[in-house]
Each structure stands twice: as structure tokens, then as C-alpha cells.
């Protein structure tokens, strides 16, 4: 009886030890930078009465480790004519995103041009800033508009 109690006790101790210890490696992040499918997104002839098409580009992590994106920011903020959608979420500022090794992320952009009652074409510009590992990277946004 005493032996079976000791065996049971040791099995509980071993089971507890195995459940507390983990075989999973700690997550380490890459020190690399992002790469992009395009460095400039251009919208050609956007009319003020009609919205633009939605353009997309890809953000790549070419490294063998997960990459932590500290910030993605539409620099014009809420006052920008451009709108962005990152990973299915609309907004102007995104933070603490993780991009797995050899993976990519879609970023969608559209624009609305405000009328100015002029006859000359308008140029609307903004930039998307990416902060990763202390490095700033920019993607330019340019739209040609007309009333």
C-alpha cells in the first residue's frame, strides 16, 4: 500500500514537472527590415465625384525569424485624403504587429479627392511610415485628381 502511494506521488510530481516545463523555444525577433512590393502607390485621374479604386501592396519579411513591426502610420493621420487597411483593419496608426518568417502582409489603400472647383488637375500626396527595429521606411502615396 505504501509503495503504491509513493509511485502515485512520484507520478504526480513527474507530471507536474513536465506540464510546467515547456519544449517551446522562446520567441526571438529578427533584426532585419521590411521589404515592399512597391515603394510608391500612384492613383491616376481620380475624380472628385467618384472614389478611387482600392490599390494593394505587400509587406514582406524575407528573414528566417519573426519580424516585429513597431508602427505603421499614415502620416497625414485622420486629415489625409488616403485611407489604409492593414490586415483587415482600417485606421491611420497600427502598432506591435508580428510578421512571421518568410511571410507577407497585405496593405490596402484608397483615396478621395475633395473638390476645389478648379479646372487644373490636383496632386494629393501622403506617406505611410513603417518603424521596424529603429529603422524608418516610407511608402509614398500619390493621387492625381480632377473636378
Region roles according to the model:
Residues 115-145:
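Terminal connector regions
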